[in-house]
C-alpha cells in the first residue's frame, strides 16, 4: 500500500509515510500540522 501525501495511514511519529507531514495518532493518518 502506497502512502499518500495526506490521509496516508501511519502508526505514530516519526513515520516515513508522512514525510514532512505529521502523524495524527488520534485518527491514524498523516495530516498537516494545523489539523493535528
Swiss-Prot record:
The keyword Cytoplasm belongs to this UniProt entry's keyword annotation: no
Disulfide partners: 3-18, 10-23, 17-30
InterPro entries membership: Huwentoxin-1
Parts forming coiled coils: none
Domain of life: Eukaryota
GO MF annotation: an example: calcium channel regulator activity
Tissue: Expressed by the venom gland.
Keyword Disulfide bond in annotation: yes
Main location: secreted
PTM sites of type Valine amide: 36
GO cellular component: extracellular region
Subcellular location: Secreted
Keywords from the UniProt entry: Amidation, Calcium channel impairing toxin, Disulfide bond, Ion channel impairing toxin, Secreted, Toxin, Voltage-gated calcium channel impairing toxin
Family (UniProt): Belongs to the neurotoxin 10 (Hwtx-1) family.
Description of its domains: The presence of a 'disulfide through disulfide knot' structurally defines this protein as a knottin.
Described purpose of this protein according to its UniProt entry: Allosteric modulator of voltage-gated calcium channels. Moderately inhibits human Cav3.1/CACNA1G (IC(50)=5.06 uM) and Cav3.3/CACNA1I (IC(50)=4.32 uM), and weakly inhibits Cav2.2/CACNA1H (IC(50)>25 uM). Acts by making a crucial interaction with a Leu residue in the extracellular S3-S4 loop of domain 1.
Identification of the protein by name: Omega-theraphotoxin-Avsp1a
Source organism per UniProt: Avicularia sp. (Arboreal tarantula)
